[in-house]
From Swiss-Prot:
Its cofactor is Mg(2+). It comes from Pseudomonas paraeruginosa (strain DSM 24068 / PA7). GO terms for biological process: tRNA modification. This is tRNA dimethylallyltransferase. NCBIfam families: miaA.
């Protein structure tokens, strides 16, 4: 038996079949499911996030789904704290935490920990917002490029939340976000030669995706069109009607939602919205693959294989997750 309690990560790109395999594992093992998805946290965003149905969630409860209103933000640090609490509760009940989802930044935060960033400062944020109103976000992006060119290269000028956070970190602490992350990398390795991580668990990491990329692309297109047929536009209309929601929020910037939002604003035709929604989802999958290719200690499975459950169970035994 492992000296640390077991945990399972089930990763993969969007539309790869993670949820189905997670539920099959939950039928076979004493698991508790914990969602690792930055869009599934939001209430009222069900169709466009491919959230499991109420019936499935009743049968297979997931922690960290429907925990925020779309007007609220949710950081990787908040996820890490919530996930660690959920994992500890599952372990205390003698169950295995099974974390499933495709938000790779969240997995990274769990495995590596987070850099010690300054907390939010309301006065600094208010000043930045006033500057943005007066000068525009492009001007703030130029400011960031002067003090933290690495972050400026990663953050688009039209991403106000991340742009404001990077400037806030610098103004509050006097050290750039990039420098703080470099210090973290020097102190904490992703994995050392022994595979140790920052989590107090023996972690088995599974990944699922179609072996052929065109299969995933076809799945993405089919699923997006199905979402539209299931009432995705009406779902976004309900969000669009709220005075406290706008296109700059993380919830509305979620893939699919921002394209339908632009359609409702009259910026896109129906055909353009559909095409851009599919393209944006494919781009998301590409980014997820990029993360996964750099990941250590992953056991890959083909989405189209008919024996993924027994293969996963066999692997979990080989890495001492199961007796």
């Amino acid at each position: 038996m492992p000296s640390l309690p077991p945990a399972i990560f089930l990763m993969g790109p969007t539309a790869a079949g993670k949820t189905d395999l997670a539920m099959a594992l939950a039928d076979a093992l004493p698991c508790e499911l914990i969602s690792v998805d930055s869009a599934l946290i939001y209430r009222g965003m069900d169709i466009g996030t491919a959230k499991p149905s109420r019936e499935l969630l009743a049968r297979y409860p997931h922690r960290l789904i429907d925990i925020r209103d779309p007007a609220e933000s949710y950081s990787a640090a908040e996820f890490r704290a919530d996930a660690l609490a959920a994992m500890a509760e599952a372990t205390a009940r003698g169950r295995i935490p099974l974390l499933v989802g495709g938000t790779m930044l969240y997995y990274k935060a769990l495995l590596e920990g987070l850099a010690d960033m300054p907390g939010a400062d309301p006065e600094v944020r208010a000043a930045l917002e006033a500057e943005a109103r007066a000068e525009g976000w492009e001007a703030l992006h130029r400011q960031l490029a002067e003090v933290d060119p690495e972050s400026a290269a990663r953050i688009h000028p039209n991403d106000p939340q991340r742009l404001m956070r990077a400037l806030e970190v610098y103004r509050v602490g006097g050290v750039s976000m990039s420098e703080l992350r470099r210090r973290q990398s020097a102190e904490k390795a992703d994995f050392d030669a022994s595979g140790r991580n920052q989590l107090p668990y023996t972690v088995a990491q599974l990944a699922i995706a179609p072996e052929q990329r065109q299969v995933l692309h076809a799945r993405i297109a089919q699923r997006f069109r199905q979402m539209l047929e299931q009432g995705f536009i009406a779902e976004v209309e309900a969000l669009h009607a709220r005075s406290d929601l706008h296109a700059g929020l993380p919830s509305i910037r979620a893939v699919g939602y921002r394209q339908v939002w632009d359609y409702l604003d009259g910026k896109l035709s129906y055909a353009e919205m559909t095409e851009r929604g599919i393209i944006a989802t494919r781009q998301l999958a590409k980014r997820q693959f990029t993360w996964l290719r750099s990941w250590s200690h992953l056991h890959w499975m083909d989405s189209l294989a008919g024996d993924n459950l027994p293969r996963a169970l066999k692997y979990l035994k080989t890495v001492s997750i199961l007796a």
